[in-house]
Amino acid sequence: MTRVKRGNVARKRRKKILKLAKGFRGSHSRLFRTANQQVMKALRNAYRDRRKRKRDFRRLWITRINAAARANGMSYSQLIGHMKKANIEINRKMLAQLAILDPQAFAKVVETASAAK
């Protein structure tokens, strides 16, 4: 059997991990073993949080819409129900933006939705 020298392959593999660990503190960016553990943990967290971010933003939008709706004398659930009946198809992200950046326009949406009870 021929001898296999893994020098280049192993070095490349380790350098790849250490490159990903750049910016980590202390030995987490210098020693291969701890760096490898931290990179795996970071990638796992990134994967999980890419999905969590979508849920977090939806919760934030709903909270903002609820606050603005209550300022206009209606709860969030009532507003969404009335909007469905009035065929107003504005998504939650746009509604939250309206509530913050243009309160008068948001008030108009609430008024239009409540008119179509």
Swiss-Prot record:
Pfam families for this protein: Ribosomal_L20
Domain of life: Bacteria
Gene Ontology CC entries for this record: ribonucleoprotein complex; ribosome
One GO MF term: rRNA binding
Cysteines paired by S-S bonds: none
Alphabetized InterPro entries for the sequence: Ribosomal_bL20 (IPR005813), RIBOSOMAL_L20_CS (IPR049946), Ribosomal_protein_bL20_C (IPR035566)
Keyword terms: Ribonucleoprotein, Ribosomal protein, RNA-binding, rRNA-binding
A Gene Ontology biological process term: ribosomal large subunit assembly
Function: Binds directly to 23S ribosomal RNA and is necessary for the in vitro assembly process of the 50S ribosomal subunit. It is not involved in the protein synthesizing functions of that subunit.
Family: Belongs to the bacterial ribosomal protein bL20 family.
Matching PANTHER family: 39S RIBOSOMAL PROTEIN L20
Protein name: Large ribosomal subunit protein bL20
Organism listed in the record: Crocosphaera subtropica (strain ATCC 51142 / BH68)
